């Protein structure tokens, strides 16, 4: 029987040009494209090559033309500061247009790069959209990132202006941006021409040089700016991904394909219409923030929420429920780690019962693999579909998902459901042959990738080809490992460098983590491989417990080891499960398994630029030493 999903998916694969041409009719073009896809120079494919449009026009002006000017575009809620604000589409356009005029006054023209190093405040969104309005290319850097990381982005992008703030806030602490910015400017070889500081109330700083200007001052004599016409294949933004060494990779997003694909996803993947309120609990410094706090919801014309807070500690594990209740949110998109944190602090869901969540219809998880136990916990608590889906900074939207706006598929716990229309996903062996159903391998996507995905790296075409497009001919290598089952469900088990080899058996750390997370006392866990003379590698488990657990650590460890032996088998040689206070993560919630492995193997490692709290690594090192895993 042909289902609606199968019909749409097959049409996207069998005739992608017709499929995307029809979808492209749904956005605003100054000049509609006559060519859908240029494939004459693979892997540098170009979508809607001769089309002319504008990112900001589609996000704001087009919605106002459609009669949505008085509708709320952006809700800001900061439990850290207590500040709240709402902006209609007209109000947001006015602020964006004025700031675009301010950038124009500072000499910013089409194609110039602008770095945005900001906390989660409305001014950050305004700056992003203002860049799009005048054709500048923004590069958002996570607010509070280390000076050397900011400097590398300044040097690679050759940005003219840096837009920043006096500070950011984390639970219980203020992060001053001035020392970080000053440090970056000293390290950077490229010289920034101007720095615009947004002064946070009560945390104003003194401006030290003629290069520095306050947000309010730069707006004082600015004029409104209209949107400039942009070719479809010009760039909307650069978003850098951190490598462990060398120059970070600058992912670039072309304008036309970005608008077409992201607007389509809001209804087809997330079932969001223009009348709905949508919340993506991420940060604008990450791809989820770019795509699903700012661009996709505004392209769709719905209401989007900008949240300056954390899932726990601002003030408690009920803040997510308060936001959903206050703003009548239909769907939430966040990382699995957010729900693990809530589950750890409030395993019984006591905070949940205090709020009215009658508007809430679905929860979407992505960022790293969602273990089945967390999904089931959330399902039981929320009584709505909880959907794990999979995508990457490089793609900007989901590769596999349960497309709720097309047709709900049956849930298979541990799978990110089926390929999204547009993505021809395969699993391959290193010899370039296809795997059998349920056989582990490298997950790849047939070229050309759909619109909205990255078309190259900033000033690094050869690096783009070599890194992503050369290992599997005519395929994009995702660097994720997993399998596809007999029903077409995609199981993303781990990054390819998280596959461990135990006595010749290739095992996924994700498969072992899935078992550990089923233990009733375990809130979250991480598995990594250490070097072993006899077996090559051995898996080690780190487990963090739920709040209020009474059972002793030794008993829990023994039970976890037995569970892995029972469910994965003796082949895993899993003999060590260490209870730790907390796990080392990036600010976006990814667990730093590779860094922990290096600590365990006494290898040199670089402090990850994205680490949430560097002190955790010392805690982990001491735990490993106590358990005879690492030597001083």
Pin down the residues of each PLM region.
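Conserved AMP-binding/adenylate-forming core of the ANL superfamily
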Residues: 56, 74-129, 146, 150-151, ...
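Conserved pre-ATP/AMP-binding loop-to-beta segment of ANL
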Residues: 70-72, 195-198, 208-240, 247, ...
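Structural core segment of the AMP-binding/adenylate-forming
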Residues: 129, 133-217, 336
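AMP-binding/adenylate-forming catalytic core of the ANL superfamily
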Residues: 141-166, 181, 325, 332, ...
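AMP-binding/adenylate-forming catalytic domain of the ANL superfamily
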Residues: 193-199, 534-537, 566-591, 603-629
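Conserved AMP-binding/adenylation subdomain of ANL enzymes
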Residues: 259-277, 287-330, 344-350
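Gly/Ser/Thr-rich phosphate-binding loop
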Residues: 302, 330-334, 343-410, 424, ...
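Conserved ATP/PPi-binding loop(s) of AMP-dependent carboxylate-activating enzymes
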Residues: 418-422, 433-468, 507, 604-605
């Amino acid at each position: 029987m042909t289902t609606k999903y199968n019909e749409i998916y097959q049409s996207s694969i069998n005739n992608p040009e017709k499929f995307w041409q029809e979808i492209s009719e749904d956005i605003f073009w100054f000049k509609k494209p006559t060519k859908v896809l240029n494939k004459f120079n693979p892997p540098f494919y170009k979508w809607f090559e001769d089309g002319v449009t504008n990112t900001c026009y589609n996000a704001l002006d087009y919605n106002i033309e459609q009669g949505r000017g008085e509708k709320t575009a952006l809700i800001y809620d900061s439990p850290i500061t207590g500040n709240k604000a709402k902006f209609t589409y007209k109000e947001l356009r006015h602020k964006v247009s004025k700031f675009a005029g301010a950038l124009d006054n500072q000499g910013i023209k089409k194609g110039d790069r602008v770095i945005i190093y900001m906390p989660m405040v409305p001014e950050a969104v305004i700056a992003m959209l203002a860049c799009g309005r005048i054709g500048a290319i923004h590069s958002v850097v996570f607010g509070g990132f280390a000076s050397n990381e900011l400097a590398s982005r300044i040097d690679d992008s050759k940005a003219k202006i840096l837009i920043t703030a006096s500070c950011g806030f984390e639970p219980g602490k203020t992060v001053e941006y001035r020392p970080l910015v000053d440090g970056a400017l000293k390290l950077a070889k490229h010289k920034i021409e101007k720095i615009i500081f947004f002064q946070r109330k009560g945390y104003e700083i003194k401006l030290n040089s003629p290069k520095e200007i306050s947000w309010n001052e730069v707006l004082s004599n600015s004029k409104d700016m209209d949107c400039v016409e942009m070719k479809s294949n010009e760039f909307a933004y650069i978003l850098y991904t951190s490598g462990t060494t060398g120059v970070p990779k600058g992912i670039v997003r072309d304008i036309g394909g970005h608008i077409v694909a992201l607007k389509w996803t809001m209804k087809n993947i997330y079932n969001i219409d223009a009348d709905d309120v949508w919340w993506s609990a991420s940060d604008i410094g990450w791809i989820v923030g770019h795509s699903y706090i700012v661009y996709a919801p505004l392209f769709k014309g719905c209401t989007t929420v900008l949240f300056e807070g954390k899932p726990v500690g601002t003030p408690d594990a009920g803040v997510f429920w308060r936001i959903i209740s206050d703003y009548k949110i239909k769907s939430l998109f966040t990382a699995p780690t957010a729900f693990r944190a809530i589950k750890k602090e409030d395993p019984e869901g006591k905070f949940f019962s205090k709020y009215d969540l009658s508007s809430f219809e679905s929860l979407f998880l992505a960022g790293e693999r969602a273990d089945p136990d967390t999904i089931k916990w959330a399902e039981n608590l929320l009584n709505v579909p909880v959907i794990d889906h999979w995508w990457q900074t490089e793609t900007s939207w989901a590769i596999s998902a349960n497309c709720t706006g097309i047709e709900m598929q049956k849930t298979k716990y541990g799978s990110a459901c089926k390929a999204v229309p547009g993505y021809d996903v395969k699993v391959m062996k290193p010899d370039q042959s296809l795997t059998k159903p349920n056989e582990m391998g490298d997950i790849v996507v047939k070229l050309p990738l759909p619109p909205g995905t990255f078309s190259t790296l900033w000033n690094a075409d050869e690096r783009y080809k070599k890194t992503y497009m050369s290992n599997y001919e005519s395929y994009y290598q995702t660097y994720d490992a997993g399998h596809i089952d007999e029903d077409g469900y995609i199981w993303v088990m781990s990054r390819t460098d998280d596959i461990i080899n135990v006595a010749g058996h290739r095992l996924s750390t994700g498969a072992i983590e899935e078992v550990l997370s089923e233990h009733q006392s375990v809130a979250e866990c991480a598995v990594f491989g250490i070097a072993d003379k006899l077996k090559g590698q051995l898996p080690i488990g780190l487990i963090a417990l739920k709040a209020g657990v009474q059972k002793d650590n030794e008993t829990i460890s023994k039970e976890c080891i037995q569970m892995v032996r029972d469910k994965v088998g003796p082949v895993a040689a899993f003999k060590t499960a260490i209870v730790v206070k907390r796990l080392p993560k990036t600010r976006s919630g990814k667990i730093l398994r590779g860094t922990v492995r290096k600590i365990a193997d006494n290898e040199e490692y670089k402090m990850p630029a994205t680490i949430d709290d560097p002190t955790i690594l010392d805690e982990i090192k001491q735990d490993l030493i106590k358990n005879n895993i690492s030597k001083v």
